[in-house]
Amino acid sequence: MSAASESKYSTEVLSELLSKLQVADNKDEAASNISTFLNSSIVEHDVPVEFFEDLKKQIQSKDAKVSLAALDAYKHIASTNGLSPSVEPYVVDLVSEVAVKAGDKNKDVQTAASDALLAIASAITPTAVKAILPKLIDNLTNTNKWTEKVAILRAVSQLVDTAKAQIALRMPELIPVLSESMWDTKKEVKEAATATMTKSTETIDNKDIEKFIPQLISCIAKPTEVPETVHLLGATTFVSEVTMATLSIMAPLLSRGLAERDTAIKRKAAVIVDNMCKLVEDPQIVAPFMDKLLPGLKNNFANMADPEAREVTQRALNTLRRVGAVGENDSIPEVSTAGDIDVTLNEFNKLVADKKIAKRFDVALNYIAAIAGDLVDEREIQPEAWLQNVLPFATIFLHEKEAKEIIEEFRKRAIDNIPQPPSFEDEEDEGEDLCNCEFSLAYGAKILLNKTQFRLKRNRRYGLCGPNGAGKSTLMRAIANGQVEGFPTQDECKTVYVEHDIDGTHADTTVVEFVIEDGEVGLTKDVVVDKLREFNFSDEMINMPIQSLSGGWKMKLALARAVLKNADILLLDEPTNHLDTVNVAWLVNYLNTCGITSIIVSHDSGFLDNVTQYIIHYEGFKLRKYKGNLSEFVKKCPSAQSYYELGASDLEFRFPEPGFLEGVKTKQKAIVKVSNMSFQYPGTSKPQIQDINFQCSLSSRIAVIGPNGAGKSTLINVLTGELLPTTGEVYVHENCRIAYIKQHAFAHIDNHLDKTPSEYIQWRFQTGEDRETMDRASRQINEEDEQNMNKIFKIEGTPRRIAGIHARRKFKNSYEYEISWMLGENIGMKNERWVPMMSVDNTWLPRGELMETHAKLVAEVDMKEALASGQFRPLTRKEIEEHCAMLGLDAELVSHSRIRGLSGGQKVKLVLAACTWQRPHLIVLDEPTNYLDRDSLGALSKALKAFEGGIVIITHSAEFTKDLTEEVWAVLDGRMTPSGHNWVQGQGSGPRIEKKDDEEEDKFDAMGNKIAAAKKKKKLSSAELRKKKKERMKKKKELGDAYVSSDEEF
């Protein structure tokens, strides 16, 4: 039998079976016969178009029996296992007609239509969702019949099970329709829509919002729940990749949250937008939601009064614009049409134009276009996937061989239309791979890296660059602790993290024992000693306790231990911290010649230039690799210029202006003076520093330089009162406030890691004094002080001892102090006793009489007076946030993040902010370049230049100090040689410092209440006084007895 005859025969059989269906006693059996014949006995390249046209007419029939039988046949066809590709497109094409029947008046027809919809939703090819879903959505939107709506909603729920991944991509068009159905007046529709919405959220693969999905669905139906839901999500840590499905369920909440009246809700909605959008990888993911989110953020930024909330909104706007690739004038990029059925159909029709495809195959062509559109939306580019999904339907009208060729060309053309997210090829060369993996990394409440590639080769030196808080140190520690997914284990690749500060628990351990005791080294003492000598350790140093080593030598010791572990990869976090220039040069030479792969985090641009072969840079939660050293990297990435030049930083720091110092009329006058000072630690053979002379003023810009162990930090500790000099004199102006940031800056905050920065500052200054300075040696009363304080004074003929010093007032060119007394009785006898006297017996003594015996008590009073002269600052959240913002910490970190979760650089900024809270006159920085990134270093450099007080800096970074300091203190072997100084006696020359009344800041009491200061009257000249007198006399003459004078007339 010929193909034409067979086709005619098939059509006749189907017509006969369909006509029998109407009169059959067992309709299920008759429908099953049709299904069996359709799915197995049709001739290849033939489609029973006439049968489906007849079936469509019967489904639409107003006769319930006819329609019921046709729907039963439709259900059986769809329910057959292995629905034939030549039948499936035509079955799906009738979905709209079947859905309409679900709203029929006849209950049996309604049920049959509903069951038929479920059957086709279960049987459809998953990638053909774009062929069926638009039809269902169209029916759902346009019908008024609630039974039809319920049937369609149940079918959509079934589609989620059939094609979960594909429905996830359709969520942007599905969620608005489901939301509208949830507001339907019919209870059954509301319930079905809520159930379908819940079912559709199964496509959302995002663990961050999983537990909030019930609340997200609920607030769609009940807008009053939006504020509470925003609050819940505002405290969420977002670390999972954000997909189109995730944004589909979040966008309705966020757009409503941005439109709420309450500023706090608007702010939190902006925070959520900011945090979620950072995890979007492709602009096309966020494109469908831009018209909802962007206008809301812009409107809030323009109209909100709260500056902090506006700042948060601005940050969210910047993130959304960057992620969404928003153009100039906020032109929103169009959503890609590469996956539209019209586009893919047009491409396919071009490819088969010469094949003369018959009209009856149009339905199949549209079906292929829908499948191709889904593959494009899924970013599927593999040829196997295209063949598997498209070939069964293309062979309806093409031979298999030519179909494969056409599909491959179709695939190439389709994927060329897909907009590609930014991607970068690593600049690599040949060599042995030590690591090649993909991973994500989060720290606390922050995503650091999201599905990034990481590849390392043997004998390469990599510099790891990124801003503070990007996660450089966290990545290094994660690698060392085996927490990076896919990174080789220690057995496969020995990775050693070189600590920049050895744990204090080893303080008394000798250098050689420290290395030998490490279980991973496993070497004899002789081998360890030889290696330490290779690292320039002398025999004396090898047997010294670790606490006696300077910071630089501790770094060399940690490096020596790492090398002895036979490391394949060295992880070096700020290796040049505490190293002088000689040791930095040694380290450069060692890393360049040792043959060990190293990953280096450093803020020393010169060091990175001399060592690195590749730069690994943090870019949008990815790691991108650039070949070449830092200078080569900056050429390729100009935005990273601040890594190379401190002055190129756009970040700005500001220090508060120091308060007025009584008696200091020029910036040259000494506020700190040290004469013939020396210091020696107890138990040591010689002084650590000796014969030290210097002075500091408000104009001082001093760099303290010298090799490791020369005594620089000891000198500074004496200057700031941390240590008391063994001999010599240290004068500090009575009202002078000194801010001291230690070499190990984290020492200030180590015991407060579970506080927020705001809480830490409130704790530190809650009494008005700086609680961090209370343990300084200059404030501790020792036995010698107690003996001196037993001195007996003869006051008004009675023997007295000082009980306390309470207040200070001006006395000639100095001060005198209010003293409370104890009265002596029976002095020198066994029953000697000292009785506290009443406050009315208090007297005043000059400073000179007290300094010899009660210097520390006098200093306490001076400090309180100094604080009072700076005025109390209100310890309110707003004041603290504004102060911290001057040092580069935003309000989110200051008030809403624990110190434990801050990066190293952010912690240093916090220490800077806390130490300068009391508006110091002198800022002393010990190694400020440690831990701060290049941007922050540039900002710090500019802030120090603009600071109105004095600056003393210990640093090995010539780059940092070269344009900043004028005076140099060179410390070598315990002696200090100053140069470039301009020390003066008395006030010196230069412009006078005037305390201007009109420039005084607002004053506050300790509770934060503003004190209204009375304005001082301006002194009038004699001419002005005469004029006032004439005006008074004139008024008196005019008014007579009714005249009453006022203060303003005098």
UniProtKB/Swiss-Prot annotation:
Residues 980-1050 are annotated as: Disordered. Keywords: ATP-binding, Cytoplasm, Elongation factor, Hydrolase, Nucleotide-binding, Protein biosynthesis, Repeat, RNA-binding. ADP binds at residues 43, 45, 86, 395, 399-400, 708, 927, 930, 956. GO terms for cellular component: cell surface; cytoplasm; plasma membrane; yeast-form cell wall. Pathway: Protein biosynthesis; polypeptide chain elongation. The keyword ATP-binding applies. GO terms for biological process: translational elongation. The keyword Cytoplasm applies. One of its GO terms (molecular function) is GTPase activity. It is an enzyme of class 3 (hydrolase). It is found in: Cytoplasm. HEAT repeats lie at residues 46-83, 89-126, 127-165, 169-206, 208-244, 245-282, 288-326. Belongs to the ABC transporter superfamily. ABCF family. EF3 subfamily. This is Elongation factor 3.
